[in-house]
Curated annotation (Swiss-Prot):
Molecular function, one GO term: rRNA binding
Gene source species: Methanococcoides burtonii (strain DSM 6242 / NBRC 107633 / OCM 468 / ACE-M)
Keywords, alphabetical: Ribosome biogenesis
Descriptive protein name: Probable Brix domain-containing ribosomal biogenesis protein
Domain of life per record: Archaea
Alphabetized SMART domains for the sequence: Brix
Gene3D superfamilies assigned to the protein according to its UniProt record, in alphabetical order: Probable brix-domain ribosomal biogenesis protein (3.40.50.10480)
All copies of domain Brix, residue ranges: 1-155
GO term, biological process aspect, one: rRNA processing
Source taxonomy: Archaea, Methanobacteriati, Methanobacteriota, Stenosarchaea group, Methanomicrobia
Length: 155
């Protein structure tokens, strides 16, 4: 998976991209003037995550396949706990836990194992109204889901 941002991201959005890349053990790349197809062609396994900006903060996350087709779009707001400060995370394998349609979609697209959250791990707790990113038993941040849209595949 490759993570990038909108073309002119705010500092908050760039920080969120770095945190997501560190959490998922993948690469973050600044987009600059590159088009979506140019970025997609650089993806190793074909999954691209684009973090969009809204009024100076991360406002959306979109997932694209290897052909640049949108798979999932999530509109969100971000909550950081008191004392939040970005630090790189250890390269532990993340797991996902939760319930609901969004959990199933993320589990499928991100291709990370489903499992319990332990005190010495990275875990994404997913439901249809929020995504909590947990590291070493502490919440890093929470994405409050405003709405999401999945791509409907034609038969």
């Amino acid at each position: 998976m490759l993570i990038t941002s909108s073309r002119k991201p705010s500092a908050n959005t760039r920080t969120m991209c770095k945190y997501l890349a560190s959490f998922f053990n993948c690469k973050y790349m600044t987009r600059g003037k590159m088009g979506l197809i140019d970025i997609v062609s650089l993806c190793e396994n074909g999954l691209l995550m684009v973090v969009g900006d809204y009024h100076g903060s991360p406002g959306s996350i979109m997932f694209y396949d290897s052909h640049g087709v949108e798979l999932l779009s999530i509109h969100l707001s971000v909550f950081y706990p008191d004392g939040y400060k970005y630090t790189p995370l250890k390269a532990l394998e993340p797991s996902i836990n939760g319930d609901g349609e969004l959990f199933n979609l993320l589990s499928y697209y991100l291709d990370i194992p489903e499992g319990e959250c332990y005190y010495d791990s990275k875990c994404l707790i997913a439901s249809d109204d929020h995504l909590e990113f947990v590291y070493l038993d502490n919440m890093l941040f929470r994405l409050n889901i405003k709405n999401y849209r999945k791509m409907v595949m034609s038969e």
